[in-house]
Design a protein with these regions (language model features):
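Terminal, non-globular segments
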Residues: 1-176
């Protein structure tokens, strides 16, 4: 019974983090434009989930965060969920492949995820019939990369809390 209780708290914490991130995204970050682009806090949550839990956890968090964000965006429903899921899998797989090297690799992965998000969103959006100008991708990608790189280390601590310190050794190595 204790295991179910722990899972329930983990689920509630995860939902709380996603809802708070969404509220901050649409209320605070939406007004902090840099070169016409805004940071993506939900993307940072997905990146941190992939780093702390691997590809499976990154995919699950990516899908959930993407669907939640799709509810408030004026884009084809599922577009953000698809891109976040792909990024969660990629970051989780890269984090597993890199292993416990420590250092700045979470920041590098987060920056790469920001660039990938801008590219994937544009490519998949154009495939489903939403015309996104490809010329805007580098600028948007750089803004997303910068925001993601800055916010990923604090978000790793949040994800550690969500999962009840389930992987403290890995996180302690990451955050040294």
């Amino acid at each position: 019974m204790a295991g179910l209780s722990g899972r329930r708290w983990t689920g509630l914490r995860a939902a709380l983090v996603l809802v708070v991130a969404l509220v901050l995204q649409v209320s605070v970050l939406a007004d902090l434009r840099v070169a016409g682009a805004i940071g993506d806090l939900l993307l940072v949550v997905v990146v941190a989930a992939g780093i702390t839990g691997g590809a499976d956890r990154g995919a699950a968090w990516g899908f959930a965060a993407g669907l939640l964000y799709d509810l408030v965006l004026d884009t084809p429903f599922g577009l953000t969920a698809l891109t976040y899921t792909l990024i969660g899998v990629a970051v989780g797989a890269a984090g597993t492949a890199i292993g416990r090297t420590g250092g700045w690799w979470p920041v590098v992965l987060a920056a790469a995820a920001g660039l990938a998000q801008a590219t994937l969103y544009t490519v998949i959006g154009n495939v489903v019939g939403v015309a996104y100008p490809a010329g805007d991708v580098p600028g948007i990608g750089l803004v997303l990369a910068a925001w993601s790189a800055v916010l990923v280390l604090p978000m790793l601590r949040v994800l550690w809390w969500v999962h009840g310190h389930s992987e403290p050794d890995r996180l302690e190595v990451l955050l040294r």
